[in-house]
Design a protein with these regions (language model features):
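A short, N-terminal amphipathic alpha-helix
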Residues: 28-30, 42, 214-223
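Short, basic, helix/turn surface patches
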Residues: 61-72, 206-220
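Active-site-adjacent alpha/beta core region of enzyme catalytic domains
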Residues: 74-188, 221-246
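Short acidic, glycine/proline-enriched helix-loop-strand junctions
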Residues: 191-215, 225-230
């Protein structure tokens, strides 16, 4: 019986940078996936990694993260906040994130990735939606569409939002796709924060990472004992907000 391995990338805002170091460590020890699954910021990292699943690709991803600023991802202004109060919608324009994706991604369709790639998004009904073909940029934008912050993205007639809402740690999907060995690249959470982040989006992202951590533990307990599951250790103590791109 063939043994398939999957890398599962979780969400977590700017803490997604931690996954770059995890990838470097895994590859240096000869651990390679047969396919990858990602949700939220994990979808972004999974998509880049699937495009170049080697040390050189990880080095490229590291350079992207090192050059990233908060304004590149969350271009929020006073005018946008006032506009939200007057006309409820979303706070940030996803244009910056789209430009980031299109400037660095070496392919345009998910099915063109060198290794199989699966992106998770959430439907309006709260169901997990798997994206494995079609425009890569749209899939990433859908999976990272944090409610209120970014607008939902229409794909195949459905308005989709952040994959972390329904399936932030999609280990069950990895198992359904045939993985018997699952390596989870979790972003962790700011376990050493003494008080919540001051900015509203920072607080929302911090709450999301706390939810992700508990969701991860719960999902592990529900998986079959026949699966070989490894969760890459996260950083703790950690006092960096998932909204901090410094």
């Amino acid at each position: 019986m063939d043994t398939k391995a999957a890398f599962v990338f979780t969400g977590g805002g700017s803490l997604g940078a931690i996954q770059v170091g995890m990838l470097r460590a895994l590859l240096s020890h000869g651990v390679q996936p047969d396919f990858v699954v990602g949700a939220s910021v994990g979808a972004l990292n999974a998509t880049y990694f699937a495009g170049a699943p080697n040390i050189e690709g990880v080095a490229m991803l590291e350079r992207i993260w090192c050059g990233l600023r908060r304004s590149d991802v969350f271009p929020i202004s006073l005018a946008s906040v006032i506009g939200l109060l007057r006309h409820p919608g979303n706070i940030a324009d996803p244009g910056g994130l789209r430009r980031l994706i299109e400037a660095h991604l070496p392919y345009t369709k998910l099915e063109d990735a060198p290794i199989p790639l699966n992106i998770m998004a959430t439907s309006p009904e709260g169901l997990a939606v798997r994206l494995s073909s079609g425009p890569a940029a749209e899939a990433i934008l859908a999976s990272t569409a944090i409610p209120v912050v970014f607008p939902p993205v229409e794909i195949d007639g459905k308005m989709l939002m952040d994959g972390a809402v329904a399936a932030n740690t999609p280990m069950r999907l990895a198992a359904e796709l045939g993985a018997s060995r699952i390596i989870v690249l979790s972003t962790g959470y700011a376990c050493a924060l003494k008080e919540p982040p001051k900015r509203a989006i920072g607080r929302a992202l911090h709450a999301l990472t706390l939810m992700i951590n508990w969701q991860l533990m719960h999902e592990v307990e529900q998986l079959s004992d026949d699966l070989d599951v490894h969760i890459v250790p996260t950083l703790c103590p950690l006092a960096v907000s998932p909204f901090d791109f410094s």
